[in-house]
Amino acid sequence: MTHDLRPGLRVYSHAGLEIGRIAEVRGDFFKVNAPRRPDFWVQAIDIIAETQAHDGVMLRRDAKHHAAPEHAE
């Protein structure tokens, strides 16, 4: 499944709680700006759904946090 990842999209946990917004996209990775906690990177394969309004994505329960990708396009 291909996702139109772009800054500003909301990011939700598998339970439906908003955890932040996409701050940056590098290739198949995106950075989540999470209020009250450090920002983190997630790989697009960890997305399980998009919101009906196409303004957000939901992450898998076991989504892994990654270091910033160096040379992703």
Task: Please report, for each region that a protein language model flagged, where it lies by residue.
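Peripheral interaction segments used for macromolecular assembly
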Residues: 1-73
